[in-house]
Amino acid sequence: MSKLGQVVEAVEKYNRFVLDQVKRARSDQKFGRELINRWNETMAKTPVTHTPTGLPLPRLALPEIDEPGEIARYLFGEGLPGEFPFLNGTYREMYLEPVREIETGSYGKRASSSGPKEKESGDGPRPPEEPTRLFSGLMLAEDTNERFHYLTQHQRTHRLSTAFDGPTLYGIDSDADGVFGKIGEGGVAIDTVEDMVRLYDGFDLGSPNFSASMTISGPAPIIMAMYIAAAKRRFGPKVVPKLRGTVQADIFKEVQAQNETIFPIEASLRFLTDMVEFTTREMPRWYPISISGYHIGEAGSTPVQQAAYTLSNGFAYAEMFAARGIPVDQFGPRLSFFLDCGLDAEYIALARVSRRIWAIGMRDAFDAGPRGQLFKLHTQTSGRSLIAAEFKNNLTRTAAELMLAYMNATNSCHSNSADEPFTTPSEEWIRLAAHGQAILLEESGIFKHTMNMLSGSPGMKAVERAVEAAILDEFREIERLGGVLAAVEDRFQRSQIQNAAHRYEQQIYDGTRPIIGLNKYRNGEDDAPEIKLARTPRKKQQLQVDRLAKFKKKNAEKAKCALDKLVDVVERGENCFPALLEAAEVSSLGQITGRLQEVVGRFRPMV
């Protein structure tokens, strides 16, 4: 049995444990009184704050129950926000405004037992950062840098999320044959460490108020090495342990949903593990992988498939890192996740259930400590839900998806722009997308006064139960096939995603899935935006090629030595990331990719 099979057993065992605690609370008077006293104490110590109109509200909303069995069901089955099994949130206060007027003390007495293996849970209060993180990347590094400064001009914390162009995603240099017209299209062109310096110019990379997220997987270790090299150029080597951020680096989802993989699967996983081994030891604030369901969802999966494949991929990575000898409490806290949020009913509780399954699986199948149990989540509203027909409706779609994302207590969120069916978003529509989050979190009172404002309804509970059961069924099928890697090689996830995508399109075609303005309530008018499509001017593309040529000429001898050393380390089977760091100082992305492919080969895309 693989670890995934153990996770299924762990969740089933924990659910039985919860039922046992419910029965015990009803039959054991002493235990029942202890639970009632703990519940009453928590409620009594919950601060009371006031809305702008003066209405008093508890800072933590709890169900009004006094029956010991139901208290046990809540404390053990759900947990308070920030407590195992984290159904209601990774941290205690998430999006709440800083405390101003408090009439009572702070809540926080933890349950005396969190399951069959008692461990203190939680990770302290959440850092005071805005959860908004907008995705951006266009033309050359300096153009994206300008957009970054525009997006963060009103934010206390600078949380940048970077999109790369096609050549960069495939590890190809801008001067490669057939690439010229694709430079800077749909993302930023990054060929060298010098580009990386330009990309984040003006930001203090070592500041606790800065973090960078880089959406790239195939050449992720190379891009990560360039980011470290750029940081060292600007701030010196002592900045490395201070760097905060995420690189996506999710090879499994690439093979399952995208095909943006440049090395064979086993080699890709080896390079990833080399990077994780280095960063978890040397960069304690960095997340070296973002286990991503977003692309799985955008490729056409059902919500349950998205969550199941993402979680199973995560457990497979954890098993792989542990096999390398990396301690679970070293890599566990540095794993992060990325999910899509659409409009189907499953999204009401998809992330909540995922958080619970991850916590139980990591604790009971991997023996992870409290910090390694946390499902730290970035959510993005659904790009697939945005359509060109009557495109202004996309504002409402995204607003509804934002509501669902924050109901699930996501740690950070990107809201898509309404004009994305046509082009790389313009500043006008990006501003509206960002303001959508600000209105929800800062202007409205839905999330800023009270934790658990919208959780716990009978409908949400029904969705949670159904989604968890469906995810475990997906786990069982993957386990039957021999685990995640075997299923990937058998194209199982990919074929299931393709089948789901076909059903989705068929439902739109036959009208069983209504899309307002497309197959229902059409007004017949063309309201396409009158905006200029985002294109990289040829002179900018030529500038990128010229810069790259100059860099290669300047570093020709050093690059040869560094690349020879890198190849030697790879052939000896050692951790190649330190050698990759040296190569990133003097070699281009394409040069490094090319030499590594000479050693390990190329990935054959799956269809």
PLM-predicted stretches and their roles:
Residues F180, G187-A189, M403, M451, ...:
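Residue-level marker of motif borders
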Residues F210-I216, A299-P303, S385-E390, P421-T424, ...:
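A short glycine/serine-rich beta->alpha loop
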Residues G5, E9-E12, R16-Y347, A365-H378, ...:
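Catalytic alpha/beta active-site cores
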Residues A308-G314, S336-G517:
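Active-site capping/gating regions of soluble enzymes
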Residues G178-F180, A299, N394-L395, E442, ...:
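Short hydrophobic/aromatic segments of transmembrane alpha-helices and their interfaces
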Residues R16, R156, D201-L205, K232-G236, ...:
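Generic secondary-structure signature for well-ordered alpha-helical cores
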Residues M139-D143, Q155, I190-E194, G218-M226, ...:
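Conserved active-site and cofactor/substrate-binding residues in soluble primary-metabolism enzymes
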Residues M1-S113, R126-L138, E142-H149, T157-G166, ...:
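Flexible, glycine-rich loop/tail regions that form catalytic "lids" or insertion modules at the edges
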